[in-house]
Amino acid sequence: YAFFGTDGKPCVSKGLHYAKMVKTYDDNGYVKTERYLDLSGQPTWHDGICGTDYIHDAMGNELENKPVGRDGSLAPGKLIIRNKYDRVGNCTEYAVFNLNGPALNSWNIHRCVMVYNSLNQETERRWDDVSGNLTTYNTDKYAIVRYKYDLLGNVVSTAYFGVDKKPVKCNEGWASTLNVYNKMGKIVKQSFFDINGNPTDPKVMVPVGICDYDKWGNMTFIASQDGHGHYIINPQTGWAILRMTYDSHGNCLSRAYFNVSDKPMANSDGYHKETYKFNNDNNCTEHAYFGTDGKPMLYYSIHRETYAYDTNGNQV
């Protein structure tokens, strides 16, 4: 493709800094090269490269991605990406190289290896350094992540492991999690565990989150628990339970907050409940706030906001 000015002449895009991008294709119809060109038809720089060379297999899987400079060699500061695939097209390895061989990317990773089960579901992902040793991913502390699935293909377990292949916490503060799903495939319970398999410390990560949905799939209930069936205050949100209601169009009509005893409480903004009303066009016409006693209250000196719309649905 190419860019043209109002005079009909070729021009350089101010944001992209090139006048034309051209591609070539291999015998199977997959992109072989991409080049950014200036007004003279010569390679020019865009985001640190002048283009990319690709290699694909017969199935169209990308085997190599090489960012290049003006002379077609590897662009300065860039890396060659090489991928491997299994017989059904699952990517089993991603690795980066420079002109001297194996290299590290900006996340300090040379290679990522993926493992799949007979249903083509990814069951493990691990990261290696240039020596083939396990290394931690980015700023996280794990080198391996493993997944388990139910018969419907939902992820029921995620677990992290360090370079010593022992359980380790991710940055969020948990080492493994278990998920329970309803018949609609929505999570109704999520449990988090530490490196010893015990419920996480609530100050670090809420041990259990439970939720429920209406028949349309709208979330109507979400709560935090301690791993032993008791409600707790989520230190991140400041409440234990949130209940929501909806109309038949999926518009949220109310949100209300409750404490560990399932009694009305105020959220961090100071109100217990907020309600909404909608017109036939599903435009919100009213937003109001209420206290723990169920009576109208002021939020930023306002109890109720109303909205009006013209015949085109524009707010007026």
Language model segments and positions:
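Buried hydrophobic residues that stabilize the cores of well-folded domains
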Residues: 1-316
